[in-house]
Amino acid sequence: MTMLLTAEEVKQLALKESGELAGVAAVNTFPTSVPSRPPQAVLPGAKSVIAYGIPMLLGSISSNPRVAASHTKTVYDELNRIGYQVGRLLERAGYHAATVGSFFPLEMSKETRGLVGDLSFRHAAVAAGLGVWSRCRLVLNPRWGPRVRYAAVVTDAPLASDSPSEEELCADCDLCIRACPVGALSTEGTVDTIKCLLQVQQYGQPGFSRFLRDLVAKPIEEQQQALRQPLFWNLYQHLAMGIDYECSRCLEACPVGL
């Protein structure tokens, strides 16, 4: 038996739990991401997606990579906590709810190469009216620009949906494109995901794989020496943290919300 639960009650809980943004998108109008990750694949019978977001601290993401990565992990942990509370509210009312991890785990397959989550939080945020697309496929919020991390809860509760924003926020200033140190962003609006990944996650899975490949080819003495080098220490630290972000240049450069 289900209890009456309004979209406003659900959004207010997300805001009360320290989220700054919350909105609802209907599953039947949910935009298609590439590759397709429909909400029904997360929860069969899904009717609504509750998207919510937390702004990042500009001082933290503009600091050194250690401070920025630690801050990002803090925000992701908070997003997971909020999602669980929203899910509990929905299930206490008799509905089903599924939270999607804000970072890991990801599908590790030949098809996705660990680049695709079970649900696109950016598409959820845009569909729920929390932001609009930028030229380089960041989600822009009028108050915080692209400096917001999003997450979502999928539910079979038939909640009233919000309308996508029609506000034009991206001025095509090219500041994000010029700020990218590896040229991953283009004026045509495309993103070279691999270039971006190798810059953002220098000590992530690609870097770890290269280290192992090179390590096994070395003589035993050189292997032992490699384990006493800062490269291995950084790889270990990032594996232990479970998160790896070494670059926020495009987020810092965007003038929206500053």
Predicted features and spans:
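Non-catalytic, usually N-terminal nucleic-acid engagement modules in DNA/RNA processing proteins
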Residues: 1-81
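Catalytic cores of enzyme domains
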Residues: 33, 74-258
